[in-house]
């Protein structure tokens, strides 16, 4: 089926930076008349106000006229750049982290408790360097200035950032596709949703298999 027009996807910035560009490129190759927009924001999207045609979320809404479908699980591991690990004291347990610079989210700007990855690993420890953006956190890690929790699908883009304590620390979350119930009547919207679902699933799995 031919699809065309504008279609806006709201997604967390980690997914937007490290997964969606490949996914939408593949879709656009098959549907050149489709204009795909990625709205990358570290917060929950308001589909009722049509901020986006479809949203990818880590925690789906519990109320409202929405249809939710789980897409795929993803993992996070503690990680640091190889040069950082060579220059600093060894990390053999979580207790060793107290001697290291920690990189993470800005605590009071975590809009979804599910994204508070760090407090599960290092309770009562605020990050020394923080950002509300996954992409910025990855660039900090890549500079070799600290240790942080990184998405496995993002680590695939940074070969010099190495997972640490891989067998001891493994956070698992999931991405969900959230749509307005009224959009289920649109054949085009259903097709795009299906393409995104399959594309995100396969790209996350491909990237995670590199670790």
Spans of features found by a protein language model:
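Central regulatory/effector-binding core of bacterial HTH transcription factors
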Residues: 4-64
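Short, well-ordered beta-strand segments
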Residues: 8-10, 55, 103, 148, ...
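Short, surface-exposed acidic/glycine-rich loop or hinge patches that mediate macromolecular interfaces
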Residues: 14, 182-183
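Residues that form or flank phosphate/diphosphate-binding pockets in enzymes
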Residues: 18-19, 88, 113, 187
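C-terminal regulatory
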Residues: 49, 61-175, 202-211
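Short amphipathic alpha-helical coupling segments at ligand-binding clamshell hinges
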Residues: 184-198, 203
